Each structure stands twice: as C-alpha cells, then as structure tokens.
C-alpha cells in the first residue's frame, strides 16, 4: 500500500490533506547530481536506455525534495526510435530523427513496436523504479501525444515553422491521419505496458498542440487524445490508473478535453486556473499551472505566486481546493536554482494544507 497516495486521490478528485505537488522535468539538468551522471554516462540516450541509470535519475529529486510523485526518466521520442526512425541528439540542437516520415510509403513501413522487446529498457526501468520507491510515492509513466510525436516524426526534429507537417495536413490529410492512427495505437500500447510494469499514473504530453488553429486542433490532435482516454485500459474504482492529458496552449479546449474520458487535464500558465476550472465544470481534476519562470524569482515571490495559483483554482471550483495537482505550466529548465524548488515545494505544502 502506498505511504503517500495524495496524487492518486487528487487525480480522482478525492479529499486530500493538502494539494499534492510534482514537477515536469523534476529530474533534469538543473540538478548537479543529474549533470554528474550525464557526464559519466556520456550521452542522454545511454541514460534513458540503461534502466539502472534511468532509475537513479528518476529518484534524484525525491532525495532532495518531499515531492508527492516520481516521474519516469525517459523521452517522448522513444516510440519513434523503436519504430526505426533513428533517434539521436545533437549538442545544442536537441533531438533528431535520422529517417523522417514524408510520404504514405514511409508510413506503411511503420509498425507498432513490441513493448517488451524494442522498448523493454523502459519497462525494466519502470519495474526497477517501483522496487526502489518501495511504495513511498506513486510513479508516473508517460508518452508524447500522437500529434506531438507526428511533428517530430515528420519534421525530423524540433521546428519553428512545422512546414512539413502543416503542408501534409493541408495537402494530404488522409496520409497524416494514417500516421496519427498508427502512432495512437503505439501510444496506447506503450502506456498500457508501462501500467502493467508498475506505473500508477499516466500522462500524455501534447507539447505542440498549441501550434494548431482551433479547426486543426479539433481535427488532428483532440480526436486522438480522446481515443487514448477512451481505449486505454486503466482498471476501475480505487484500482483505476488515472490519466492526465497535458497540453501547451490547450486552454481553449479544456471543456472538450474534460469530456474525453480522462481523469485529469494538465494546463500551462497561459490560462488562469479559475477559468480552466470553470470550463472543466468539475468533470476532471486539473494539474498546473505555475509559470516555470517564477522559479527565477525570490522565495517570497514564489510563495506569493503559489498562493495566487491555489486561490485561482479554488475560485473556479466553488471554493474547494480538491481535484488540484500543483505543477508547473511546463518543464523545469537548466538554469533554475534547486533552492528555489525547495522554496516552491515548501510553499505549496504550507499554503495548501486543509
């Protein structure tokens, strides 16, 4: 039995003694101990593909901060890599895929990878982390969203214009839907395998959904997020594994996401939580949404923004703080001070206590 189940209870909108907190990219380059492991390992991919290293990095922030969850150390591009698109990282430029998808012929060659062969290292990491956590806090597994993965798979890496995928959306929408369906099948299998290996909550990162117009979002992102929420087997009752659908720029679609079948919606800092709570109408828990740049401020400024965020959620949720998981609106960045993270966690725990 979990010693700390605040996160799981909050994601189900159950009563908790205080608002739980975890942070996107809580294990990362802002931590000197992470940088030490990275230097010794020699590459990001070696860390992500070595279960013992992935476990060590996952646990690093838990040794520093009294967080309410661990999140698997991995990368959303492990699925495209397992599909044969040859993931590699270029220093200063980020991830690159050596075989980008540009036509229907390339899509027909893609297959959903076997989760216990091509992606066994991920499942082994999940199993090892669960063992090392020893039921102290829940472990969150994750995947990229179909749209976000398709962006990388078609562009071949990060992009400013997303010209290739947007051209496909306008000129060959059927081809893009073919790719999105294949990727959605892979995401569902990937999340199910993480759950079977021991993940106790799951999150989908729709990082690039916000680049789409409303019509395009409702065509190429939302339907596939909904498929995941409705088709991913997560159990029932108190044994149900909660799902969080997080998206940058998803504020206009919160009401629709709340009806998707997910347990929770993660939001960025470009919408007030009060507005997000009103739009979700009590159908889902909400996760977020402190501007990550707040961590560059003083501890007093951080505490002020924590209070404002907590109050904003309650104002849109009938005065109640139930159903809220505190998080950033996006991930930690390398220049952040671990002491300011300590100040953030302390402020959330102190100010949200019921």
UniProtKB/Swiss-Prot annotation:
Catalytic class of the enzyme: lyase
Positions of disulphide bridges: none
Gene Ontology molecular function: any one: uroporphyrinogen decarboxylase activity
Record PROSITE patterns: UROD_1 (PS00906), UROD_2 (PS00907)
Residue numbers marked as site, Transition state stabilizer: 75
UniProt pathway annotation: Porphyrin-containing compound metabolism; protoporphyrin-IX biosynthesis; coproporphyrinogen-III from 5-aminolevulinate: step 4/4
Matches recorded under SUPFAM superfamilies: UROD/MetE-like (SSF51726)
Keywords from the UniProt entry: Cytoplasm, Decarboxylase, Lyase, Porphyrin biosynthesis
Subunit annotation: Homodimer.
Name recorded for this polypeptide: Uroporphyrinogen decarboxylase
Gene: hemE
């Amino acid at each position: 039995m979990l010693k700390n189940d605040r996160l799981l209870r909050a994601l189900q909108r159950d009563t908790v003694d205080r608002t739980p907190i975890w942070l996107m990219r809580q294990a990362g380059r802002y931590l000197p101990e992470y940088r030490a492991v990275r230097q010794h390992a020699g590459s990001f991919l070696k860390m992500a593909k070595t279960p013992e290293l992935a476990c060590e990095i996952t646990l690093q922030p838990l040794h520093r901060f009294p967080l309410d969850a661990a999140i698997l150390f991995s990368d959303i591009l492990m699925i495209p890599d397992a599909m044969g698109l040859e993931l590699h990282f270029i220093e200063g430029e980020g991830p690159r895929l050596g075989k980008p998808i540009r036509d229907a012929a390339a899509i027909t060659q893609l297959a959903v990878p076997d989760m216990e062969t091509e992606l066994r290292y991920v499942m082994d990491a999940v199993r090892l982390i669960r063992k090392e956590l020893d039921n102290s806090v829940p472990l969150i597994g994750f995947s990229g969203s179909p749209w976000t993965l398709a962006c990388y798979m078609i562009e071949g890496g990060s992009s400013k214009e997303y010209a290739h995928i947007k051209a496909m959306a306008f000129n060959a929408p059927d081809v893009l839907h073919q790719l999105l369906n294949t990727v959605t099948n892979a995401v569902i299998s990937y999340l199910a395998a993480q759950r079977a290996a021991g993940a106790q909550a799951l999150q989908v990162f729709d990082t690039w959904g916000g680049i789409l117009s409303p019509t395009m979002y409702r065509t190429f992102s939302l339907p596939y997020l909904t498929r995941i929420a409705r088709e991913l087997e997560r159990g029932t009752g108190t044994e149900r594994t909660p799902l969080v659908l997080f998206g940058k720029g998803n504020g206009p679609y919160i009401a629709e996401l709340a009806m998707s079948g997910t347990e929770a919606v993660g939001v960025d800092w470009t919408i007030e939580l009060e507005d997000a709570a009103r739009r979700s109408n009590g159908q889902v828990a909400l996760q977020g949404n402190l501007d990550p740049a707040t961590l560059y401020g003083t501890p007093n400024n951080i505490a002020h923004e924590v209070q404002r965020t907590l109050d904003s959620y309650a104002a849109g949720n009938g005065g109640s703080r139930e159903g809220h998981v505190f998080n950033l609106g996006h991930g930690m960045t390398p220049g952040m001070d671990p002491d300011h993270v300590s100040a953030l966690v302390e402020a959330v725990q102190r100010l949200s206590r019921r």
